[in-house]
Amino acid sequence: MNDKTQHFSFDDAMEKKVKEILSEVYSALKEKGYNPIAQLVGYLISGDPTYITNHKNARSIIRRIERDEILEEIVKFYIDHNIE
C-alpha cells in the first residue's frame, strides 16, 4: 500500500470548458422550468443523465465532461470565494 498523497491536476482549459458546459446546461434546464441546481445535483450524485433535459441538446453536452471534472470546478469555486 502506498501512503503517498496522489496529486490531481486540473488545467485552465478544462476549467473554462466546465464553466461553458454548466452554463449551457443550466440555461436549458431553466428554460424547461426545472430547478437547475436540483437536477444537476441529481446527475452529479447518481450519474444518471436523465436528470438533464434533452432541450438544446443539454444531455449530450453535459456528457462531454466527466462528473469529477464538474465537481472539481464547483469545489474550487466554492473554496476561492468562501475560504481563501
UniProtKB/Swiss-Prot annotation:
Pfam families associated with the record: IreB (PF06135)
Domain of life: Bacteria
InterPro entries referenced in this protein's UniProt entry, alphabetically: IreB
Paired cysteines (S-S): none
PANTHER family: UPF0297 PROTEIN YRZL
Stored NCBIfam families: PRK05473.1
Similarity comment: Belongs to the UPF0297 family.
The protein, known as: UPF0297 protein Csac_1773
Organism: Caldicellulosiruptor saccharolyticus (strain ATCC 43494 / DSM 8903 / Tp8T 6331)
